[in-house]
From Swiss-Prot:
GO terms for molecular function: 3'-nucleotidase activity; 5'-nucleotidase activity; exopolyphosphatase activity; metal ion binding; nucleotide binding. It is an enzyme of class 3 (hydrolase). Binds 1 divalent metal cation per subunit. A divalent metal cation binds at D12, D13, S44, N102. This is 5'-nucleotidase SurE. Its EC number is 3.1.3.5. InterPro entries: SurE, SurE-like_Pase/nucleotidase, SurE-like_sf. Signal peptide: none annotated. Keywords: Cytoplasm, Hydrolase, Metal-binding, Nucleotide-binding. It catalyses: a ribonucleoside 5'-phosphate + H2O = a ribonucleoside + phosphate. Belongs to the SurE nucleotidase family. One of its GO terms (cellular component) is cytoplasm. It holds the Pfam family SurE.
Length: 275
């Protein structure tokens, strides 16, 4: 990059996670100014939730990172962390928001639940370039390759002109750096789960439920996006890096049936909706 960037980094795995340390250290190694604001504990699958009924506390955690990296551990959600950083903790707006490296994939429909993606999306909502990055295996603990991939993609995208409202979601296969495949634009795939709840009983015989389940990657589902792009699920399964463009807008742009309600006009066709 022509000049050092001001980078804000968050995650949903918490301040002690190895993934966020690898990402922060790689960004700092390249000469960028790095600030970490992330949850003080595991906050996975919190989506875009915010803390409204209790205070949010932030404690400095510089000692957990390399020299020169400023860090705060917050009691809130990933979205809280980015909001607090942008609204109170940072002296100036960052040039880039990064989230991750997540311990596990954020592919296809998983992004709806992901705190990692939500933290990056918070940056997008504030008009900032943002990238979420995940290592596609929960047990993998070698994050250096994913950190390099994330910074390469982010720096390249910024140099090329980052469109406003674009969130990049990067998933890196869990293999050694020299075996990581090529980066490709991907469309969101479909991931479904079976046997989602495990019923258990406490010592007093009362039942409780533990969210578990087994993921089923659906390679046949059409998904969304250009059909000549692979799905992110298929790309990572094949050993490549999946880069998926996302946006906060949720408006449906396909065809709609007429509503069976008096006084409501027929739905526009797909072409009109896209216009």
């Amino acid at each position: 990059m022509a000049s050092p960037l001001k980078i804000l980094i968050s995650n949903d795995d918490g301040v002690f996670a190895e993934g966020i340390k690898a990402l922060a250290h790689e960004a700092a190694r390249r000469g960028h100014s790095v600030t970490v604001v992330c949850p003080d504990q595991e906050r996975s699958a919190t989506g875009h939730g915010l803390t409204l009924q209790s205070p949010i506390r932030a404690e400095q955690a510089d000692g957990l990172f390399a020299d020169g990296i400023r860090a705060w551990a917050c009691t809130g959600t990933p979205s809280d962390c980015v909001k607090l950083a942008l609204g109170k903790l940072l002296e100036a707006p960052p040039d880039l928001v990064l989230s991750g490296i997540n311990h596990g994939p954020n592919l296809g429909s998983d992004v709806i639940y992901s705190g990692t993606v939500a933290a990056a999306m918070e940056g997008t909502l504030e008009g900032l370039p943002a990238l979420a990055v995940s290592s596609a295996c929960f047990d993998w603990r070698q994050f250096d390759g994913a950190a390099v991939q994330a910074m390469d993609v982010a720096e390249s995208a910024l140099a090329g002109g980052w469109p406003e409202g674009l969130l990049l979601n990067l998933n890196v296969p869990a293999v050694p750096p020299d075996r990581i495949g090529p980066v490709r634009w991907c469309r969101p795939g479909v991931r479904r789960y079976v046997d989602q709840f495990d019923e258990r009983f406490d010592p007093r015989g009362r039942s409780y439920y533990w969210l578990a389940g087994e993921v089923v990657n659906d390679f046949e589902a059409a998904g969304t996006g250009p059909k000549d792009w692979p799905t992110d699920v298929a790309q990572v399964q094949g050993g490549g890096v999946a880069l998926t463009p996302l946006q906060p807008e949720l408006f449906w742009r396909g065809a709609l049936p007429p509503l069976p309600i008096a006084g409501v006009s027929a739905a526009p066709d797909a072409a009109a909706a896209r216009g």
